[in-house]
């Protein structure tokens, strides 16, 4: 991992990052107010800035210095960039609500809170034909419970709009490029394209929030999943194709399809570093993979031993 501060036109000849640094646009590369991070000489750069205050051109350093940095953009090894715009105040403060790509196209990300979605659902319930049974606050709560990762603020992406296109400035679409709906628990329910056609649908286990039990692409059959008591998938059911069963043992997972073909995955490591180190395929062949102490792939051996 490299952490670099802007303000320098070039890196020394032979430096690992010299070519990647030189591909950055000058306004990024020469700005001492930006920090950049990368974990590869192939990129991308993660551009770290701040959204609270933009320094003036005459400022040597922002005053006061920000106590932390946030992701404000990306730059790849060809100099193409993505720039993120964040909300400065309100319920969405700090959230990304705008993106500009390397071609100059500007996109608006419409975010909603759990309270907004709950109010919309209750209003829709009152105006529906079944208004005798309005949606209760308990059925669609205004807040979401915390998760193992911390508090859930309930903020979700609801739509993506194209706001500016330099190539076609007068031909902007009158509908969002994509639209998303959610369950009362904040789970992704459906995805719609720019023609308002539903292209994805998801179903969840009511007893286990966030556990997807089915999903479907438009025009395709619904895929369903069964879980064991520990939350692991034990069966994947496809009514129009191959289904799979999963058997979990110590350091191995056996996968059997609906044609009774079997593969065995041998694993090593624990928690986030568990990796598949050997795969026994249905035809009897074996492939192997090697990893370093950080869990990064270092070698692969095919079925012929190469």
What are these regions (language model features)?
Residues 1-306:
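Extended charged/polar low-complexity repeat regions
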């Amino acid at each position: 991992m490299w952490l670099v501060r802007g303000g320098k036109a070039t890196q020394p000849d032979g430096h690992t990052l010299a070519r990647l640094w030189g591909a950055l646009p000058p306004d990024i590369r020469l700005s001492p107010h930006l920090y950049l991070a990368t974990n590869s000489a192939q990129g991308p750069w993660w551009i770290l800035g701040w959204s609270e205050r933009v320094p003036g051109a005459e400022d040597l350093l922002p005053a006061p210095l920000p106590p932390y940095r946030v992701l404000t953009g990306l730059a790849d090894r060809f100099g193409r960039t993505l720039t993120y715009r964040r909300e400065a105040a309100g319920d969405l403060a700090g959230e990304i609500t705008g993106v500009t790509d390397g071609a100059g196209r500007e996109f608006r990300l419409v975010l909603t809170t759990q309270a907004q979605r709950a109010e919309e659902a209750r209003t829709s319930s009152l105006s529906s034909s079944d208004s005798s049974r309005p949606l209760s606050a308990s059925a669609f709560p205004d807040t979401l419970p915390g998760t193992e990762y911390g508090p859930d603020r309930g903020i979700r992406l609801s739509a993506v709009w194209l706001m500016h296109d330099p190539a076609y400035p007068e031909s902007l679409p009158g509908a969002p490029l994509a639209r998303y709906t959610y369950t009362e628990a904040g789970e992704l329910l459906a995805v719609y394209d720019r023609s308002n056609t539903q292209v994805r649908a998801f179903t969840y286990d009511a007893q286990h929030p966030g556990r997807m039990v089915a999903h479907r692409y438009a025009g395709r059959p619904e895929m369903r999943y069964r879980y064991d008591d520990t939350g692991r998938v034990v069966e994947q059911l496809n009514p129009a194709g191959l289904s799979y069963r999963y058997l979990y043992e110590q350091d191995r997972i056996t996968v059997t399809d609906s044609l009774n073909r079997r593969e065995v995955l041998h694993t090593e490591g624990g928690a986030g570093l568990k990796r598949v180190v050997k795969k026994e395929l249905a035809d009897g062949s074996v492939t192997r993979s090697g990893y370093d102490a950080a869990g990064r792939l270092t070698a692969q051996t095919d079925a012929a031993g190469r």
